[in-house]
A protein has these predicted regions:
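Bacterial N-terminal signal peptides
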Residues: 7-13
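Ser/Thr- (and often Asn-) enriched beta-sheet segments in non-cytosolic proteins
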Residues: 58, 63-67, 76-82, 107-109, ...
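N-terminal secretory signal peptides
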Residues: 20-97, 101
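Amphipathic/hydrophobic helical signal segments and adjacent flexible N-terminal regions
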Residues: 3, 16-56, 113-116, 131-175
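Surface-exposed, polar helix/loop patches in the mature regions of secreted/periplasmic/lumenal proteins
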Residues: 86-139
């Protein structure tokens, strides 16, 4: 009986820590708007100098939209990513849900077992560092083509540091 009570107490403590981390992450991203549904955009466009100095990098630009929504009474955080590769006008995108929060870090997964990313915020939520882990992207222009590619194949594409941007920077990321 004592073990049972201890396991319940531990579970409740872990649940409240998880809820506190969820709240802290949402507060950093959305600020006062964390109480309602909405979206925020983070973006980065790599300039020619950066790309010349990092020849192994394939990612030319990246935008990440985080969307807080309520569905069937449950709140959730979705992510959508849009990117272009160096030398290509083709747009690629990806998306899924975030589900594990540790302080200012959210673990976010791509739908259909397409990898994951850790999104780490600075304390004021103005900068997001994305660490990609076998993160899959695909082409939205051709819905019939479900071919995916791994976003972070090159070690130079494993980490991206983005800044909060106007929602127009996330145009075309899907929803």
């Amino acid at each position: 009986m004592r073990r049972f009570i201890l396991s319940i107490a531990f579970g409740l403590a872990a649940s409240s820590v998880h809820a506190a981390d969820w709240d802290r992450f949402l507060q950093a991203v959305f600020g006062a708007a964390a109480a309602k549904d909405g979206s925020v955009c983070y973006a980065r466009v790599y300039d020619a100098g950066h790309l010349a100095a990092n020849k192994a990098q394939r990612i030319r630009d990246v935008a990440i939209k985080l969307t807080l929504r309520t569905e069937n009474g449950e709140r959730r955080l979705d992510h959508n990513v849009v990117t272009h590769l160096v030398g290509s006008r083709q747009k690629y995108w990806s998306g899924g849900q975030c589900g594990d929060y540790r302080g200012l870090v959210a673990r976010c997964f791509v739908e259909g077992d397409g990898g994951a990313a850790d999104f780490t915020l600075d304390s004021d939520g103005k900068t997001l560092t994305a660490r990609f882990d076998d993160f899959h992207i695909w082409r939205p222009q051709d819905a019939a083509d479900e071919t995916t590619m791994t976003f972070d194949k090159s070690p130079a594409d494993k980490v991206a540091k983005l800044t909060k941007a106007p929602m127009s920077a996330c145009a075309g990321v899907g929803d």
